[in-house]
């Protein structure tokens, strides 16, 4: 029997992350569809890192002991990756960045790398994930590369034909298969992304976001369906979960406190020895409402510490807010940040706050001027001066994803950020990010439960698994990966926290 292969080239979207150690919804969806469509077949999970390793002759791109981001996320199938592609009856490629992303330990598969990998494949080839939007928008560029394209989901019934609409959640539930065989092929400890719903609950959509284009109508999953999937993953050995892959956790079932309590409590009950339970994405309009404070308290009560509720102000500039239908004003954001701080700023047993806000800023949106950056600096300074805490800040350039109003504008006159983005980002790093890190993770803070996960020129990076988890750099050290221990914070720099080991590690 020929194998069937999932080729994971990693995905990044505003609503979800599919870069290891995150186990994406796309990968699990493809796994279940292939298991149902070919129950007798050997389903193999391969990453683009496996392919890179083979094509490079089994050699890393850096000198040991440094970690190689191009082959870091290799699976147990690393040495056989090319042969598996050659022998496979079916290859499902999962790929696409809907937003720009940079990862210390990973490099998403490029179009050229995907084409090179598929040149080895003799069977049928299918695409699933955000890259499908580009494949449908510019078909000539992708001609001959894929036999069919799936934009949202894939099922055993439509696998061979392609699909441009998502399968309903009932069908997805019926098709869901055991994940044990999938998880066993991952040499890392995965954190599973759990989707709660599709679409955006706002009445007006942000012009840059791909979610309304991807899912124009809102569709919520039932609480028991989500809990059952978490239990299946738990049975497969997964102990880390993030309730992500939706635009706003707080808006689940239209901000239904009882449903959210049942969801979090159900996962805790069915996964009693979980290590991480975090959330992702929070609409500041929902968080700023009175019910937002109550939901934030539920998150702080049921989830594990070090949790983050990322919120998109996107811009503090009133002109940019109006031009791009952003709806969130600085006043609304401040109230939302206050609510999350009130609910979650208390520290857990491991030394980290239970729940803090994260902030998202986007440059390169229509209406931007040099004054936009000044407004952003003033807005951030106001939060800092108020004594509030923030877990992390993501500053990026806008990307025009196919199907969004931003993409419909076509080529724009270059905005100031085209020239000044790196300089402006450095301003935020020095005046906001570093002072906030010093406040949230002060010198002398002891952080247990860390593991070494990356060795670079500057030293060894330590982290916990979680939503935008804390990372501490032990300078001038090359600690074997997977070592566990505690570090004490010794210093800070923009985007960095430094520390030293204070306990025996194993």
Segments predicted by a language model, with ranges:
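Radical SAM enzyme [4Fe-4S]-AdoMet core and its adjacent flexible, acidic
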Residues: 254-258, 381-451
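Glycine-rich beta-alpha loop elements in corrinoid/cobalamin-binding modules
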Residues: 50, 70-173, 489
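Glycine- and acidic-residue-enriched helix-capping/strand-helix junction motifs
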Residues: 13-27
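Terminal RNA-binding accessory module
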Residues: 417-506
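A short beta-strand-loop structural module common to alpha/beta enzyme folds
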Residues: 40-57
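Catalytic cores of alpha/beta
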Residues: 136-144, 290-297, 365-385
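Conserved SAM/AdoMet-binding glycine-rich loop
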Residues: 2-7, 232-371
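Canonical Radical SAM [4Fe-4S] cluster-binding loop centered on the CxxxCxxC motif
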Residues: 186-225
């Amino acid at each position: 029997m020929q194998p069937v292969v999932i080729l994971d080239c990693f995905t990044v979207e505003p609503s979800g992350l599919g870069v290891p150690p995150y186990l994406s919804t796309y990968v699990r969806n493809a796994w279940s569809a292939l298991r149902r469509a070919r129950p007798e077949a050997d389903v193999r999970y391969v990453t683009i890192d496996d392919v890179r390793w083979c094509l490079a002759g089994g050699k890393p791109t850096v000198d040991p002991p440094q970690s190689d981001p191009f082959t870091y996320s290799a699976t147990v199938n690393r040495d056989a990756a090319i042969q598996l592609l050659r022998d496979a009856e079916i290859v499902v490629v999962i790929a696409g960045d809907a937003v720009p992303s940079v990862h210390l330990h990973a490099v998403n598969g490029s179009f050229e790398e995907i084409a090179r990998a598929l040149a080895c494949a003799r069977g049928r080839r299918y695409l699933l994930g955000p890259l499908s939007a580009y494949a449908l928008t510019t078909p000539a560029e992708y001609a001959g590369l894929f036999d069919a394209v799936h934009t949202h989901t894939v099922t055993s019934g439509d696998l061979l034909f392609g699909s441009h609409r998502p399968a309903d959640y009932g069908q997805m539930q019926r098709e869901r298969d055991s994940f044990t065989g999938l998880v066993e092929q991952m040499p890392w400890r995965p954190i599973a992304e759990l989707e709660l719903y599709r679409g955006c609950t706002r009445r007006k959509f942000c012009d840059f976001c791909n979610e309304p284009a991807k899912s124009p109508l809102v569709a919520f999953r039932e609480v028991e369906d989500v809990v059952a999937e978490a239990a299946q993953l738990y049975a497969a050995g997964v102990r880390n979960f993030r309730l992500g892959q939706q635009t706003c956790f707080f808006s689940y079932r239209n901000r239904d406190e009882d449903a959210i309590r049942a969801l979090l409590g159900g996962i805790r009950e069915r996964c009693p020895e979980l290590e991480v339970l975090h959330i992702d994405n929070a609409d500041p309009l929902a968080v700023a409402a009175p019910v937002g404070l109550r939901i934030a308290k539920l998150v702080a009560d049921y989830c594990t510490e070090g949790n983050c509720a990322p919120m998109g102000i996107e811009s503090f500039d009133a002109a940019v807010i109006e031009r791009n239908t952003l709806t969130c004003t600085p006043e609304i954001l401040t109230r939302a940040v206050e609510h999350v701080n009130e609910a979650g700023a208390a520290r857990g047993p491991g030394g980290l706050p239970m729940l803090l806000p994260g902030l998202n800023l986007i440059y390169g949106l229509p209406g931007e001027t040099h004054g936009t950056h000044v407004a952003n600096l003033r807005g951030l300074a106001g939060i800092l001066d108020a004594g509030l805490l923030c877990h992390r800040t993501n500053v990026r350039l806008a990307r025009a994803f196919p199907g969004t109003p931003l993409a419909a504008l076509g080529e724009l006159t270059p905005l100031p950020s085209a020239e000044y983005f790196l300089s402006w980002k450095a301003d935020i790093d020095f005046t906001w990010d570093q002072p906030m890190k010093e406040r949230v993770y002060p010198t002398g803070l002891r952080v247990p439960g860390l593991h070494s996960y990356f060795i670079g020129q500057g030293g060894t990076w330590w982290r916990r698994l979680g939503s935008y988890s804390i990372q501490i750099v032990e300078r001038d050290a090359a600690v074997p990966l997977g070592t566990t221990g505690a570090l004490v914070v010794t210093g800070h720099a923009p985007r960095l926290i430094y520390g030293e080991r204070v306990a025996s590690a194993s």
